[in-house]
Amino acid sequence: MNFEKYAAKGNLFIKELAQELGEPDNRAKAGRVLKAVLKALRNRLSHEESMHLLAQLPMCIKALYVDGWKLTQSPEKIRSVEEFIEEVRKHDVPRGELDFADKEQALKAVKAVFRVIKRHISDGEAQDVEAELPRQLKELWEDA
């Protein structure tokens, strides 16, 4: 195992996200935002689709995705963007209200995470993720 390689790919992912967020020097925030959005997305997708997505993420990012995951739990019935944003805030304790202060900032952050994820997965996998999302979240995923 080449842990340096895994760390480098994870750092690149976080650096890309920090750039997308417009705060290239704030990698701590990028990490928090990534973790919160990944957990909210994970809790919305089926376990099977989560496994497919997980297989394409960099190793260090996989760790964020699976942290605290309970496979016995069924996917959340999140239907709207507002519900998704609330789920994201819930996973960014205690900074959720700061990192996702209002709907506009939250949408910007979620789209930034979605853009970076989509750059690191195949087009087919991006379509598979999109297919599992409700209409409003599909639009958010497509716009990213």
Place the predicted regions along the sequence by residue:
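Extended intrinsically disordered, low-complexity coil regions enriched in Ser, Thr, Gly, Ala
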Residues: 5, 43-77, 121-144
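Short, flexible domain-boundary/linker segments around small modular repeats
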Residues: 6-26, 30-39, 80-99
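Short, low-complexity cationic-aromatic patches
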Residues: 24-36, 42-51, 100-112, 116-131
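Short, solvent-exposed interaction modules
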Residues: 65, 69-121
